[in-house]
């Protein structure tokens, strides 16, 4: 499986450009980003994400009533038929923890839908070096 791609295209679900940057020294947390495309004629509802070797959870950046920017854990999200969702900085993203000892260039993960479908994909792990 290529980094940033998935093998669920036969189900009409495609994940593109899945990537995360390794945390700076002294931290073990990082955010991951991707594009999830739903080419099905029905909505899909994602309830969680699981990754090998590290913890991962779904989050969204929100602005509260006082104008404060906060990170909120998502219990689930949906992608409409023939639609897509972008996980981007300042929006929906995946938070990873336990990366301090992680030394690999890819990270195997899977979205889990409320209907029990597993959508496997690979994150490309990038360094912060230029």
Where are these regions (language model features)?
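C-terminal motif of bacterial Sec signal peptides marking the signal peptidase cleavage site
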Residues: 2-4
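Bacterial signal peptide processing site
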Residues: 6-8
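Compact, glycine-rich, soluble single-domain proteins
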Residues: 10-130
